[in-house]
């Protein structure tokens, strides 16, 4: 979390169970996210690109990017912050 706090504000962690989904949406801020446990797949720009994140992976999502997500078979825990 210390590394994330050095590059973003409003840092927090969240977890989801296996197979949970987020519908397509956007944010008005840039999101910096690290996968801590499990796995999650982010689907960007209406299926144009997929990012499979596992522990240790980092993603920077620009403000306004349409994205959805699918949690992996073992669930996931991520930390994120905004800038």
Residue positions per predicted region:
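Short loop/turn motifs at secondary-structure junctions and domain boundaries
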Residues: 5-6, 23-25, 42-43
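Short acidic-glycine-tyrosine-enriched beta hairpin
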Residues: 47-63
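Conserved short histidine dyad/triad with adjacent acidic residue
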Residues: 10-27
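A generic "binding-loop/recognition-motif" signal
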Residues: 18, 28-29, 47, 65-66, ...
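Short, conserved beta-strand element in jelly-roll/cupin
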Residues: 26-42
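Ligand-binding loop in jelly-roll beta-barrel domains
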Residues: 63-83
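A generic structural motif
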Residues: 43-45, 70
């Amino acid at each position: 979390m210390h590394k994330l706090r050095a590059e973003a504000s409003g840092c927090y962690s969240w977890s989801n169970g296996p197979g949970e989904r987020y519908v397509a949406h956007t944010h008005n801020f840039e999101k910096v996210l690290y996968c801590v446990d499990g796995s999650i797949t982010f689907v960007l720009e209406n299926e144009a690109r997929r990012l499979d994140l596992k522990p240790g992976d980092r993603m920077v999502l620009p403000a306004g990017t349409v994205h959805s997500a699918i949690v992996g078979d073992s669930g996931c825990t991520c930390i994120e912050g905004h800038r």
